[in-house]
């Protein structure tokens, strides 16, 4: 399973890779808990609590004393075990959980993944917000479908090659610099790598079942190596170092594209993405709405914080009969005293302009 756009889309965006986290659910919002679909976020998102890069150690956590595991009573017959924020410092004593399918250990003091080999029925493992530096000792968990090790201290993607049934992988807000060691995850549908240190999109050619890819808040300079991901419906690349929209020609099923907070100057390269319902190009350097008249299924268009000056550019959106939400604030044309009225006249289907609903 697993980003806010209220007054100001920036807030929304950060929720997405996360919100998307919602979709991805898992990406942001405190990240909420991913397991949804939507709205990754940064979400996402989600809203992602996609936030600051975390230091090697949190001084407060270092002084927090781990709980004595003998004081925790585990139900041997439980299928869902939630030990969120229990101050667990070491994974031990869980071998009695022969029937467990979901194990939540988020927000604890765990430094090492260990002693889980007996939990062979496990489908979901949540280690979000701990102090883990390495992905290891998961080889026996061959039934695992969801793995979340977001908000830890990981530097490498490793130790997941035997998890061939994995469908959702969340590694948000770590210190990962390279996408690697994922080639065996043929069933993966959602991959969340927001808020890391990744510089290139690479080594994902075999992930042909991937539906959602979240790479917001990294250091990526080019959209590339996406040709094999023909099932992708959500792509989030917010807050990177992109200057050009390219490499999307094979993503014919793409429905949501998030490219805000980059250095893009021209809307282009979307000729084959006819199914887009959401296009986020906010906070770039774009002067003109162009090359999107064929996107007739658009429902949301976010282009606030750019350099748009001409009202005639809105004609590019007239073919999108289902367009309901547009964000155009903090563009030069917003200075027009008749700004909202002109948007409504140009795009009569719109029900929300920026953060405000249209009143009739």
Curated annotation (Swiss-Prot):
LRR repeats mapped onto the chain: 77-98, 99-120, 121-142, 143-164, 165-186, 187-208, 209-230, 231-252, 253-274, 275-296, 297-318
Tissues expressed in: Widely expressed.
Alphabetized GO MF terms: enzyme regulator activity; protein phosphatase regulator activity
Biased composition (Acidic residues): 53-63
Cellular component aspect of the GO annotation: chromosome; cytoplasm; extracellular exosome; nucleus
Highest rank taxon of the organism: Eukaryota
Effect listed in the UniProt record for changing residue 280 to A: Severely impairs the binding of protein phosphatase 1
Basic and acidic residues bias spans: 17-34
Record's keyword annotation contains Nucleus: yes
Intracellular or extracellular location(s): Nucleus
Keywords of this entry: Acetylation, Leucine-rich repeat, Nucleus, Phosphoprotein, Repeat
Disordered: annotated segments: 1-64
Effect in UniProt of substituting residue 302 to A: Completely abolishes the interaction with protein phosphatase 1
Function according to Swiss-Prot or TrEMBL: Regulatory subunit of protein phosphatase 1.
Protein name: Protein phosphatase 1 regulatory subunit 7
Source organism per UniProt: Homo sapiens (Human)
